[in-house]
Amino acid sequence: MKQQDNPLIEQFLDALWLERNLAENTLASYRLDLHALVGWLTHHNSDLLRASPQDLQSFLAERIEGGYKATSSARLLSAMRRLFQYLYREKLREDDPTALLSSPKLPQRLPKDLSEAQVDALLNSPNVDIPLELRDKAMLEVLYATGLRVSELVGLTISDVSLRQGVVRVIGKGNKERLVPLGEEAVYWIENYMEHGRPWLVNGASLDVLFPSNRSQQMTRQTFWHRIKHYAILAGIDSERLSPHVLRHAFATHLLNHGADLRVVQMLLGHSDLSTTQIYTHVATERLRQLHQQHHPRA
C-alpha cells in the first residue's frame, strides 16, 4: 500500500473536515505531517495502532533537531493529538499516547502594525477618479473599518452589506457568522463605488460579488495583496511593515489604543479564543513604552 493512501489518516482527515470545517491548506499540512509520522513508525517497526508515547516524543524531537521551526512543530503536535484522540474515540486504540506529550515553546510574534498616520496615507493613495482605484479605496476603507480578513473581504456579496444599517454580515472561519459595523467613512466610499466604480467593472454582467476584479470575477486574495503593496509604496510605507492582514492588525491595535474593550475587539475580529486577540494588547503596550521613552524626561 502506498504511504499516501494510509486509510486511518484519510478516515481521520475526512472526519476532521466534517466536524471542524478546516481549511484545505490545514488539512494538506496535516496529511504531510501524519504521513511523515507513519513513515517514521514503519522504519521503527511500529504503526499508528501500536505507537507509544515514547515513540511519538522521539519522532517530535527528531523533527525539531532536524530544523523544524517552532510553528511547524506545534502544528505537527496538533495533528498528532487530533489523530490519536480520533483513534481512541473510535475505539481503534485503547489509549491516547499524545496525552502526556510536551508542547514546543512558541516565541510570541507581535503583529506588524501601522500608525494611524500611516493608515491615513495608505487609504488616501488610490486615485478615486479611476473606477478600479475607487474600488480599491472602498476595499481599504472597509478593511480598516471592520478588521475583516482579506479572504472575508474579497468574498463579500452585495447582499452581505446593509448600507442603511451600516453593517456587514461576515461568514468567518468555521462558517461562523458575525455582524460588524462599517462606520460612516466606509459607508460613504461603498456608496460612491457602487454608483461610479462598480458599473464599469461588471460591464453589464450579473454578478453578486461586491468587489469584483477588472475581469468581472471574484478577486483573489493574492491580487488584493498586490494592490495593498502598490498603495503602500505610493504612501511611502516600508515593505517590512506590511503583511496581507496589515489593516486588520491596525484595526485591532488602534481600537485598543483608544480604549476599546478586549472582548468587543475579539467579537469584531471573529476570534473564538480571547488569547488570540490579547496579542494586540502587547502591540499597544509596546507603542506606549516607545512613546514614554521618546518623550518622558527621565525615560
From Swiss-Prot:
One Gene Ontology term from the biological process aspect of the record: DNA recombination
Localisation: Cytoplasm
Residue span, Tyr recombinase domain: 109-293
Keyword Protease: no
Activity regulation comment: FtsK may regulate the catalytic switch between XerC and XerD in the heterotetrameric complex during the two steps of the recombination process.
UniProt domain Core-binding (CB): residue ranges: 3-88
Molecular functions per Gene Ontology: DNA binding; tyrosine-based site-specific recombinase activity
Active site: residue positions: R149, K173, H245, R248, H271, Y280
Coarse class of the protein's main subcellular location: cytoplasm
GO cellular component: cytoplasm; Holliday junction resolvase complex
SUPFAM superfamilies the record matches: DNA breaking-rejoining enzymes, lambda integrase-like, N-terminal domain
Keywords on record: Cell cycle, Cell division, Chromosome partition, Cytoplasm, DNA integration, DNA recombination, DNA-binding
PROSITE patterns: CB, TYR_RECOMBINASE
Function (record text): Site-specific tyrosine recombinase, which acts by catalyzing the cutting and rejoining of the recombining DNA molecules. Binds cooperatively to specific DNA consensus sequences that are separated from XerC binding sites by a short central region, forming the heterotetrameric XerC-XerD complex that recombines DNA substrates. The complex is essential to convert dimers of the bacterial chromosome into monomers to permit their segregation at cell division. It also contributes to the segregational stability of plasmids. In the complex XerD specifically exchanges the bottom DNA strands.
UniProt family annotation: Belongs to the 'phage' integrase family. XerD subfamily.
Subunit structure: Forms a cyclic heterotetrameric complex composed of two molecules of XerC and two molecules of XerD, in which XerC interacts with XerD via its C-terminal region, XerD interacts with XerC via its C-terminal region and so on.
Full protein name: Tyrosine recombinase XerD
Protein source organism: Yersinia pestis
